[in-house]
C-alpha cells in the first residue's frame, strides 16, 4: 500500500501552522533553538512530513496530527541533520532515527538538544557556575554613578578609530552621531547622540538634523558621521579616503574607543559618557588579559579564506579571538574553565552549547538594535560576518534587563527547551488563536547510540554521528524512509560561519584536531556540476540503505534554473524518480534573508522520490508542461485559500516541482535532464500565466510583473 504522502499532503493546513510557528519558533519548538544554526526548517511541517510518510494512504492525517502515534517499527534517516528538526520530530512520533551531518557542530548541538537530563541537576550545575564566577564576571561590568554608588552596565558602546593618513589625527568612524533610538521611531522619536566636540551624550530625535550639545553648546547635525559608504572624511583636515585602501596599508584590525554606556540606576536605564571608573576597569582588564595571553590560554586559530569570511579578512581579522574584546575573552575563558570541569558528558555538551550560543551576542561585530526590542543585533543577523564600525559590548553574565547573556539565555533557551522536552506540545490554530496541544508526543529524552552497532541492537532509539553522508556505516536496505533538508545550491556556506562557534566548542569538548569544520565533501558549492555531484553521492548512499519500497523526501527551493537542473540530475543519477511535490511555508515572510532576496521565496518544495525502475515512457513535451501548470495552479489555489501569501518566486517553486514529477514519465534519464536544461525559455511565459490566472495574495509585489518575473538571473 502506498504512503499517504504519495497521494496527498495538507499544504494549506500545514502552511497556516508553519506561518504561525515562523514568528515564534523559539517558543513553539524551543528544543531546536538552544544554539544557532542556519536555515532551520519548521517543526510543524516536518512533523507533517514524517507522519504522512509513516501513514498509509487511507489515514486521516489531520486527525493523526493531534493524536498519539508510535511508529517504533520504522526507521528514519536524515543525512543532512543540521539542527535536528527531522530527528526530533520523528523521535516525538516514536520512530527510530538516524541523524548524520558532515559538520561536527551539528552532531554536538543535536546531541545536546535531545539527550536525557534531570532538570534539578542542570539547575544545580548552573548555580554552581554562578557561585564560582558570576561575581568576578560582573565586577568587569560595573560602573560608579555620580552619587558614588556602584551599578551594573548593560551595554558599552564602542566606535572604530584610526589615524588620518594626511594629518595623523585620531578619527572616529561614526556613521551617524545618533547611536540609540527606538526600534519603531515613529512610536517613540526620542534618541541619543554623541557630541563631536566634547563627546557628551545628548537627547535628540531620530530624524533631527540640527542639535546643540547641552554640555559644550556645539551645534551639529546628528545624522552625519565621519564615514559614509566606505569613504572616511577626516574631521580635522577634511581629507577624504577609502577605508578599504587604508586597511591595505596595515596588518591589524582597527582599534576601538569607548564613547558611551547604558547603565541601570535604581532599575532605570540611563545613557552616560564613560567616566574615570570605567577606564580604571579597562586598565584592570588590560592587565588581566596580558596575563591570560602570556599563558597562551587563548589559542590562535586562523580564519580561513572563504566566501563568507573574506570580508573580515579584508579588515585584517586573522584569527577568531580577534573578534572579541579583551573583557569578553576573559569572561569567556572563565566560563570555558568552569564547563570543562563538568564530569557528565551530556551536561558538558549542554552548557558548552549555552556558552557557545551567547557568543553570537557577545563579540565586537554586534550592534545596537535600539530601545523597545532585544537590544543586541547579533553577528549573524545578515547571514554573513559583517564588520561593524559602531559595535556594542553587552554584559556577558547579564542582568534581568539584558539581551543575549549567559544567565538570560539559560532561562530562555535551556530551561524552556527542557520543559518542552518533557512534554512536547503541538501548535493548533482555533479562531486565529494559538493553542498548545500536550500529552500526544513521546518525550524527547532520548537514549543516543554512540555507534550503529548499538543502535541496530534495538537499544537506543536515536543514533547521531558526523561525517560524510555519502559514506555511512548503515546496513543495506535497513531504512524505511529518508527525510532531510539538504543545502541549497549556491547558498550560505554554513561551515565558514560555524567555525566562529567551533573555535570555542572545540576547546571545551575536544571535538577534533581539525581547526575548521570545513570538509571537501560538504554539499555547498557555487558550481552547479560540483553541487549536483556531491548531492548525488549522498542520495546514492540513501538509495543503498533505503528499503526498496522506501521513500526519499527532502525540501528544496531555488530561483535560478540551474539550481533545479542540478538537484534533478542528482536525484536521477542516484537512482530515484520524483513522484510528488508539495509547496509549503518555509520562512518568516519578513526575515532578513527573504527580504534581501532578489526574487523572494517564502515556500519550500517537498519533493517525494522513490527508487526508479520499470517506468513506462510517456513522452510529450507539451503535455508535461500543461499538466505541470494545471497541478501547480491547484496547489497555489489551496495555499491562497488558506490565506498564505504566494510570491512570483513561490509560484516558480510550485511549477518546477510539478515539472520534476512529470519529467519521470519520459523514462529516460538523459532525455529528462536535457529537456530540463533547455526548457527555461518556455517556463517564463508559463509562470506569467500561472500568476495572472490566480487571484493570489502576492507577497512583496513590484510595480510591474515583468521585473518580478526575472526568476532565472
Feature map (PLM): residue ranges:
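Nucleic-acid modification enzymes, centered on SAM-dependent nucleic-acid methyltransferases
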Residues: 1-77, 87, 91-471, 475, ...
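Conserved beta-strand signature within the Rossmann-like core of class I S-adenosyl-L-methionine
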Residues: 510-512, 550-556
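Short, surface-exposed connector motifs at secondary-structure boundaries
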Residues: 94, 547-552
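Conserved SAM/SAH-binding loop
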Residues: 83
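Hydrophobic beta-strand segment of the Class I
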Residues: 482-483
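A short glycine-rich, Lys/Arg-flanked "PGG" loop and its adjoining helix->strand segment in the class I
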Residues: 532-548, 569, 573
Amino acid at each position: 500500500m502506498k504512503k499517504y504522502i504519495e497521494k496527498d499532503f495538507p499544504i494549506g493546513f500545514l502552511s497556516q501552522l508553519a506561518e504561525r510557528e515562523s514568528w515564534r519558533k523559539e517558543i513553539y519548538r524551543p528544543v531546536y533553538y538552544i544554539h544557532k544554526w542556519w536555515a532551520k526548517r519548521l517543526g510543524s511541517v516536518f512533523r507533517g512530513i514524517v507522519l504522512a510518510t509513516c501513514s498509509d494512504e487511507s489515514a486521516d492525517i489531520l486527525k493523526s496530527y493531534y493524536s498519539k502515534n508510535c511508529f517504533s517499527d520504522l526507521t528514519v534517516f536524515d543525512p543532512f541533520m543540521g539542527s535536528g528538526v527531522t530527528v526530533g520530530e520523528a523521535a516525538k512520533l516514536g520512530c527510530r532515527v538516524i541523524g548524520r551531518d558532515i559538520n561536527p557542530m551539528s552532531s554536538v548541538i543535536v546531541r545536546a538538544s535531545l539527550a536525557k537530563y534531570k532538570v534539578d541537576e542542570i539547575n544545580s550545575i548552573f548555580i554552581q557556575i554562578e557561585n564560582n564566577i558570576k561575581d568576578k564576571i560582573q565586577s568587569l561590568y560595573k560602573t560608579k554613578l555620580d552619587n558614588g554608588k556602584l551599578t551594573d552596565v548593560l551595554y558599552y558602546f564602542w566606535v572604530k578609530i584610526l589615524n588620518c593618513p594626511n594629518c595623523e589625527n585620531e578619527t572616529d568612524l561614526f556613521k551617524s552621531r545618533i547611536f540609540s533610538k527606538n526600534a519603531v521611531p515613529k512610536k517613540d522619536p526620542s534618541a541619543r547622540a554623541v557630541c563631536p566636540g566634547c563627546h557628551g551624550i545628548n537627547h535628540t530625535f531620530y530624524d533631527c538634523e540640527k542639535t546643540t550639545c547641552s554640555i559644550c553648546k556645539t551645534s551639529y547635525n546628528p545624522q552625519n558621521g565621519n564615514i559614509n559608504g566606505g569613504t572616511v572624511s577626516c574631521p580635522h583636515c577634511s581629507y577624504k579616503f577609502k577605508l578599504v585602501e587604508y586597511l591595505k596599508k596595515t596588518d591589524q584590525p582597527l582599534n576601538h574607543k569607548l564613547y558611551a554606556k547604558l547603565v541601570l540606576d535604581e532599575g532605570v536605564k540611563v545613557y552616560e559618557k564613560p567616566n574615570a571608573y570605567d577606564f580604571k576597569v579597562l586598565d584592570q582588564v588590560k592587565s588581566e588579559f596580558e596575563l591570560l595571553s602570556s599563558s597562551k590560554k587563548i589559542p590562535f586559530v586562523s580564519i580561513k579564506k572563504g566566501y563568507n569570511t573574506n570580508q573580515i579578512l579584508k579588515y585584517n581579522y586573522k584569527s577568531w579571538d580577534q573578534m572579541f574584546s579583551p573583557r569578553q575573552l576573559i569572561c569567556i575563558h572563565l566560563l570555558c574553565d568552569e564547563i570543562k570541569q563538568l564530569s557528565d558528558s551530556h551536561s558538558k555538551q549542554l552548557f558548552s552549547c549555552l556558552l557557545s550560543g551567547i557568543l553570537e551576542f557577545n563579540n565586537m561585530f554586534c550592534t545596537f538594535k535600539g530601545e523597545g526590542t532585544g537590544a543586541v543585533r547579533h553577528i549573524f543577523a545578515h547571514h554573513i560576518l559583517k564588520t561593524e564600525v559602531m559595535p556594542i559590548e553587552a554584559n556577558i553574565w547579564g542582568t534581568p534587563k539584558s539581551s543575549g547573556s549567559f544567565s538570560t539565555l539559560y532561562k530562555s533557551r535551556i530551561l524552556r527547551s527542557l520543559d518542552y522536552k518533557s512534554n512536547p506540545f503541538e501548535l493548533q490554530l482555533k479562531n486565529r488563536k494559538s493553542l498548545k496541544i500536550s500529552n500526544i508526543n513521546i518525550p524527547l529524552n532520548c537514549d543516543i547510540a554512540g555507534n550503529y552497532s548499538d543502535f541496530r541492537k534495538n537499544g537506543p532509539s536515536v543514533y547521531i554521528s558526523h561525517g560524510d553522508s555519502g559514506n555511512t556505516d548503515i546496513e543495506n536496505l535497513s531504512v524505511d524512509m529518508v527525510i532531510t533538508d539538504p543545502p541549497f545550491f549556491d547558498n550560505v556556506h554554513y561551515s565558514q560561519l560555524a567555525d566562529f562557534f567551533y573555535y570555542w566548542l572545540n576547546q571545551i569538548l575536544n571535538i577534533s584536531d581539525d581547526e575548521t569544520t570545513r570538509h571537501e565533501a560538504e554539499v555547498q558549492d557555487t558550481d552547479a556540476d560540483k553541487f549536483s555531484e556531491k548531492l548525488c553521492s549522498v542520495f546514492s548512499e540513501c538509495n543503498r540503505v533505503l528499503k526498496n519500497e522506501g521513500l526519499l523526501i527532502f525540501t528544496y527551493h531555488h530561483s535560478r534554473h540551474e539550481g533545479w537542473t542540478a538537484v534533478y540530475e542528482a536525484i536521477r543519477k542516484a537512482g530515484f524518480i520524483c513522484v510528488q511535490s508539495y509547496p509549503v511555508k518555509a520562512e518568516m515572510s519578513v526575515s532578513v534573508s527573504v527580504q534581501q532576496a532578489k526574487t523572494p521565496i517564502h515556500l519550500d518544495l517537498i519533493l517525494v522520490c522513490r527508487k526508479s525502475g520499470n517506468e513506462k515512457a510517456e513522452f510529450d513535451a507539451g503535455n508535461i508542461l500543461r499538466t505541470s501548470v494545471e497541478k501547480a495552479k491547484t496547489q497555489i489555489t489551496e495555499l491562497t485559500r488558506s490565506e498564505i501569501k504566494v510570491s512570483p518566486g513561490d509560484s516558480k517553486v510550485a511549477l518546477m516541482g510539478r515539472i520534476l514529477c512529470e519529467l519521470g514519465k519520459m523514462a529516460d534519464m538523459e532525455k529528462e535532464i536535457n529537456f530540463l536544461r533547455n526548457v527555461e525559455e518556455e517556463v517564463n511565459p508559463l509562470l506569467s500565466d500561472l500568476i495572472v490566472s490566480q487571484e493570489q495574495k502576492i507577497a512583496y509585489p513590484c510595480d510591474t510583473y515583468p521585473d518580478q518575473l526575472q526568476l532565472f538571473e
